[in-house]
């Protein structure tokens, strides 16, 4: 009888440990994706810029190391305003998932000129206030991917 209780206790402990590990993993992955989103797309201090802004920021944010990232958008809003987009109505993402949200923000779109080589990539800048779509995950939801 004692061995059965001991076995059940160990089994319960194992299940709880595995469950705990399962809960930790997604939040770590989500945080990594959130940090990547911040690095690649958020620049709240700037109001946008010219071609030189894109050239400097793309290099500074490590998107020109191996090859030139062809297109990137920097959002010029406070992170809390961007996170607020995650509380809007869910819409369909390009990948078919329903975890995207849209909002209107100030942006700089950086498009690679097509005739540069990494790490000295060259970009054309276009600033505007426009609709963006971002994917959000977690509880509370945070932006993890720039969809369009």
Swiss-Prot record:
Domain of life: Eukaryota
SUPFAM superfamilies (UniProt xref): RNase A-like
Places the protein is found: Secreted
Stored Pfam families: RnaseA (PF00074)
Chain positions found as Pyrrolidone carboxylic acid: 30
Induction statement: Induced in response to insulin.
This protein's record includes keyword Signal: yes
Residues annotated to bind dUMP: 36, 41, 69, 72-73, 146
Active site: 41 (proton acceptor), 145 (proton donor)
Cystine connections: 54-110, 68-121, 86-136, 93-100
Enzyme Commission no: 3.1.27.-
The keyword Transmembrane helix belongs to this UniProt entry's keyword annotation: no
Tissue: Expressed in the cortical tubules of the kidney (at protein level). Also expressed in the medullary tubules of the kidney.
Function: Cleaves preferentially after uridine bases. Has antimicrobial activity against uropathogenic E.coli (UPEC). Probably contributes to urinary tract sterility.
Protein name as it appears in the record: Ribonuclease 4
Organism: Mus musculus (Mouse)
Record lineage: Eukaryota, Metazoa, Chordata, Craniata, Vertebrata
């Amino acid at each position: 009888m004692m061995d059965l209780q001991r076995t059940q206790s160990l089994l319960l402990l194992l299940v709880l440990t595995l469950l705990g590990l399962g809960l930790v993993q997604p939040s770590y992955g989500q945080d990594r994706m959130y940090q990547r989103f911040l690095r690649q797309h958020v620049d709240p201090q700037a109001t946008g810029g010219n071609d030189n802004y894109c050239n400097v920021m793309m290099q500074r944010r490590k998107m020109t190391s191996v090859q030139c990232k062809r297109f990137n958008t920097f959002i010029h809003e406070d992170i809390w305003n961007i996170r607020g987009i995650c509380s809007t109505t869910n819409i369909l993402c390009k990948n078919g998932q329903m975890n995207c949200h849209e909002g209107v923000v100030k942006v700089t779109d950086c498009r690679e000129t097509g005739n540069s080589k990494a790490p000295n990539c060259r970009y054309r800048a276009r600033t505007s206030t426009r609709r963006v779509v971002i994917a959000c995950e977690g509880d509370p939801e945070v932006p993890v991917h720039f969809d369009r």
